[in-house]
Amino acid sequence: MGSGWHEWPLMIFTVFGQCVAGGFIVLALALLKGDLRAEAQQRVIACMFGLWVLMGIGFIASMLHLGSPMRAFNSLNRVGASALSNEIASGSIFFAVGGIGWLLAMLKKLSPALRTLWLIVTMVLGVIFVWMMVRVYNSIDTVPTWYSIWTPMGFFLTMFMGGPLLGYLLLSLAGVDGWAMRLLPAISVLALVVSGVVSVMQGAELATIHSSVQQAAALVPDYGALMSWRIVLLAVALCLWIAPQLKGYQPAVPLLSVSFILLLAGELIGRGVFYGLHMTVGMAVAS
């Protein structure tokens, strides 16, 4: 019982991975629109490096959870049959295709057609990666607190909240501005509203879930307080992002960086609660 902090490597891996998948979609769409000058496009591609740094941190964290890099390779033995193997394989493919394509694009070795293909394929791989994360937990019918609609909603809402902000931050770092960027805060705000509703509904549902030895509501006694802090951090993060725009200013990169850090903190709290809610339907008591 607790807040799930003992699973911090998985918290980092899943939250960072979902934000990176969403952030890549934002940058890819900016490049696919075709209204950026060549030098601006190259700056956007250069700023994609931030995505791969975050993804690298996520994979390092996942290896710490597994204990050694060799276990990561061994976990690929059951691709197609194991949700965990599928998650690691899909994440590795997303990271490899995205990273190698980024390097070739940086070196200007991709033709316009190949670059377009790379962007589209990597966007799809990112979404598949997030879905494979969902399946690791949502396919376990003996864990009723994960075997529900709240798991896919929670994971994809992280992508819809963190992705637009991360993409906006990197586009700003690249010196890109445009009317389409103003749509990104609206996506994150909508995701935050939905996430708040999900938190309340999931909290109410916990009272109805129990095994012969355990009550789901007792797994994270501070569920309400933790989720409240999460929503507050997310709301502050989005306010820091949106407030300057309401006054007609472009948010500064340092302010956007603080905003993204606060968003990560909020989502890590939420993901910790998610792992803290692990329980089984049998006689075992989750620790």
Swiss-Prot record:
Residues 1-9, 67-89, 135-156, 202-224, 281-287 are periplasmic. The keyword Cytoplasm does not apply. Pfam families: DmsC. One of its GO terms (molecular function) is dimethyl sulfoxide reductase activity. Residues 33-43, 108-114, 175-182, 243-254 are cytoplasmic. Belongs to the DmsC family. Terminal reductase during anaerobic growth on various sulfoxide and N-oxide compounds. DmsC anchors the DmsAB dimer to the membrane and stabilizes it. This is Anaerobic dimethyl sulfoxide reductase chain C. The gene is dmsC.
